[in-house]
Amino acid sequence: MERDLITGTEEGQSAISWSAIFAGAAAALAASFVMLAVAGGFGLKLAAPWPSPSGGFDNFNPTLGAILAAIQVLSAALGGYLAGRLRTKWVNVHSHEVHFRDTAHGLLVWAVSTVAGAILALTLMVPAAAHMAAPAAAAAAAVQIEPVHAEAIAAQASLFMGVGLLLAGFTAAVAAGLGGLRRDEMHATYWSERARPLP
């Protein structure tokens, strides 16, 4: 009888708090744009800082790749932590299940923010790419980057982006778990203080 009651209570609750997930994803996106703007303000460029033989863009800047990965990790940590702190409290759920749900919220924050960021980037980049197609083609012809070297540059950029995304997903899950743990600790402290008899 008690088991049926607990099962009914759990089924009456949603295991996913979408409002917390969307709030965390929005915070992660906003933090990413702010940090990208700050990095651009400090003069971070896609091209490598050392001179190239052709005088153009034929080297990838590894500093940029590392900073972009760090931006992804930091913004994912912020979004995941917020999702963990803002989610609703689940009643009659084992602590292991609560921890799993918190980390799942972090992964969902990472997934939503990554997809939304990709859509936003494509929306902004496609018109700009169409506008800059002719000048870019002329510049590429002038620089004469070898196709093999261009593929190496693209591979390096993809490597940094992939590593950054993987680290960001892991960080978001861990941060959401920590945020949920902190939320439950504060909730328990609040109610224990209220239940304490007055002197």
Predicted regions and their residues:
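Membrane-helix interface motif
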Residues: 35-50, 124-132
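Perimembrane loop-to-helix junctions flanking transmembrane segments
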Residues: 46-61, 141-144
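Functional transmembrane-helix hotspots
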Residues: 118-140
